[in-house]
UniProtKB/Swiss-Prot annotation:
This peptide hormone induces gall bladder contraction and the release of pancreatic enzymes in the gut. Its function in the brain is not clear. Binding to CCK-A receptors stimulates amylase release from the pancreas, binding to CCK-B receptors stimulates gastric acid secretion. The precursor is cleaved by proteases to produce a number of active cholecystokinins. Brain contains CCK-octapeptide (CCK8) and several CCK-desoctapeptides; whereas pig gut contains intact CCK33, CCK39, and CCK58 as well as CCK-octapeptide and the CCK-desoctapeptides. Distribution differences are due to tissue-specific post-translational processing events. SMART domains: GASTRIN. The modification Phenylalanine amide is found at F102. Belongs to the gastrin/cholecystokinin family. This is Cholecystokinin. Residues 1-20 form the signal peptide. GO terms for biological process: axonogenesis; cholecystokinin signaling pathway; digestion; eating behavior; neuron migration.
Amino acid sequence: MNGGLCLCVLMAVLAAGTLAQPVPPADSAVPGAQEEEAHRRQLRAVQKVDGESRAHLGALLARYIQQARKAPSGRVSMIKNLQSLDPSHRISDRDYMGWMDFGRRSAEEYEYTS
């Protein structure tokens, strides 16, 4: 019930919002004028981009590239760590003495009463 009421209120608000927007005038004398105006607006927006913000972005990219070159990639360092481990090495935070891994028990451990 509450969900339906909320949906109706939402639809009413959306409908009222679309009806409240002004209707653009239909200028039949010059049909391409609106397209030209939109193109001019886009050009003005592009021209507003400062050279300063471009320089700031360039500095950030340069700093990121320097850090990426200095730091070893995670994959290579992981491979080196794995190669240095002994194959019989136990993972100390995951393998516990006395714990049973239920996925590896064999059927021979059980005594079945038939």
